[in-house]
Amino acid sequence: MPMVGCQVAGRTGELKSSVPTPAYTTSMYQTAYSWTNSVSIERATEHVSTRIGFTNLRSDDVLEGLNNLTRNAFNVRSNVKLTKSLDVDLNGRYTHENVKNRSYRNNSDRNPIYTLMDMPRDLSIQEMYPWKDENGKPTALQFKSPVWMLNELSNQDKKEWILADITINYKLTKDLKLRLKAALDMNMKDGYEFRNMYTPGDADGFYKEFTEKARNYTYEAMLSYNKTWKDFNVSASVGTNMQDFLFKKQNSQIGTMATSDFISLTNNGATIKSWPEYNAKKKQAVYGTASVGYKDFIYMDVTGRNDWSSALPSDNRSYFYSSYGVSFVLTELVKSIPKDWLSYAKIRGSYAKVGNDTGFDQLLNGFSYNTSYLGDMAWFESENKRKTNSLKPESTTSFETGLDLRFLKDRASFSFTYYNKNTKNQILTSTINGVSGYGEALFNAGEVKNWGYEVTLGVVPFRNKDWEWKVDINCAKNNSEVVSLANGMDYMTLTTVQNSVELRIVKGEPLVSLYCREPWKTNDEGQVLVGANGRPLSGEAKFLASVEPKWTGSIRTSLRWKDLTFSAMLDIRMGGHVWSETAFQSSRNAQSIMSLGGRTEHLFSDLILNEGDQTGYLGILDPKYVPNGKNNIYMDASRPKGMNIPGAVYDSSVPGLAGQPCQAWIKPIDYWTNDSGKNGELYLYDASYVKLKEISLGYNIPKNWLRKIGF
């Protein structure tokens, strides 16, 4: 019923006006913040240099109680010169992270925002308190309460992360050096997910614990050579690299709890389910580089690398890639250029080929073992993704050219880069027909082309001993085109949303496009074709929009006064589109302003005039009773009775009415729950934004202060 201010009994039992609640959704939100505080101390002597730092990060979410993150990081770096020929670099970083209530996004049943689309518009947040009774059961609101979800659905995880590496540099001769490096990346994580008993949709409750351990070893050896002969400078290197990654996770879960409000595996009302997860990959490589320079104005570079990855089939496990580049420093070539106005100018160009592998366990399909069917009957379930043992490594070839300039004693700088990239055998996952027994498939997708440019401008408008103001502006534009797809396909579907729109990769179009699955059918004049009931017919899937922006950019400014520096950064995106499932779901649930269309007219016809028959809605009389099709219009057809589609005409399948203007009205519940979703443009939004991404304040402690405490 319309909310026209009538006095009604509220959900708390008190009288209230039936009017939309101001700040209906915004009252749940708050401004989210992320605070970063860091301090570092450096000291250097003739043989030892050391830097010690600490960073504290605290952040929250736009919803109170979600994504409460605390991260403390300690890092130390030291270089020790043992002899004239030998030095050692030591790096270490320890991070402890604690996150309470990571948020769930989109249409997850744990996302409080998703439930807002089911809430009556006269409801206030205050009416949701208390959210449960003395027995722990939710109050009878007849919908999922976001307040319940914020208070009765929790999760937490803690992570310890260690990064460490040691590098040994040994000068074999004046021109020949050896570098050995070993690095460790290790983290340990444990946490839980909890859904209390009596949660709507899961009255039994849910609890899960997990522990994770991951480590990655990296070893590298490189021999480098640098030599100068008169006007020539030569540098070359050869090396090898090995990575060894291992991940293990143990999960324990109960799907039925014995009692509410008790977060523990011992609170088990049925059977504990436990299962492991495993991930591992090894990768080895050999590589070489060479660079030749002449008189500091021309440089030529060549690189080559061969990788072997355990994630690929044995026949395709090895892949080689290389790069070639040349650059000209014009200011070194033409010495007569005044340095006061052009201090540096370089033209560069390069060609490169880069290879890439995939993740763990993407080659062979397996089955999961279960024993809970009909008591203790064992059964096996296949994976949802169809894998393939014929995967090839991805390959990207690129051409790049650019210009770098610095002016006015480096007070201004300009950089321009143009690139053109072709990626072949891109490894992607696509949804497939369920008749195959799988929901999605992994394969090499074909060829994709990217080209575009990036421009960077930097200026220092003001600088003296105590003050300095810097401004850096960046702008980039990327274009893409799908040149071909695997097995001659015209398109592949990445995902489908609400059976209404799809994200597709389509031959001849930008890399990712939005498509409407069953759009309104139209004729050659663009008029919507409807059936006898006035509802639009479904046509063939059509292109909606590209998700790619027209251009992106950023503006960073910094102001220094003595040792104090303030900086801020704007992030810019212009163009591209998003399809809002929130807007779609809100309209389908009759909660959006958009879905008010036709509602009052329908209620007047249905409740006041009692037009329960369909004649008034159809707007026409049965053609078989009216020989002249032009005289069969219902006498009250023009009065709005719901929703209609402007300019729509009857389809050729409607006897006696083909091509005539549609006289029918659609009941709002039919239109907004079924028909509107087929008109993808209704929920399409511009993805452009300008946002303040970062604000920072830094202070360099004067050296004479540190000397007093021994640094």
What are the functions of these language-model segments?
Residues 1-66, 103-106, 131-156, 169-171, ...:
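Residues embedded in well-ordered regular secondary structure
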Residues 35, 77-86, 91-96, 137-195, ...:
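Extracellular/periplasmic, surface-exposed regions of secreted and cell-surface proteins
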Residues 15-16, 95, 100-161, 214, ...:
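Acidic/polar loop-and-plug regions of large Gram-negative outer-membrane beta-barrel proteins
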Residues 28-29, 36-59, 75-81, 89-91, ...:
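Predominantly transmembrane beta-strands of Gram-negative outer membrane beta-barrel pores used
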Residues 5-17, 377-384, 422-445, 480-547, ...:
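Surface-exposed, extracytoplasmic segments of Gram-negative outer-membrane nutrient-acquisition systems
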Residues 41-54, 558-561, 689-701:
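Hydrophobic/aromatic-rich, well-ordered segments within soluble, folded domains that form packed cores
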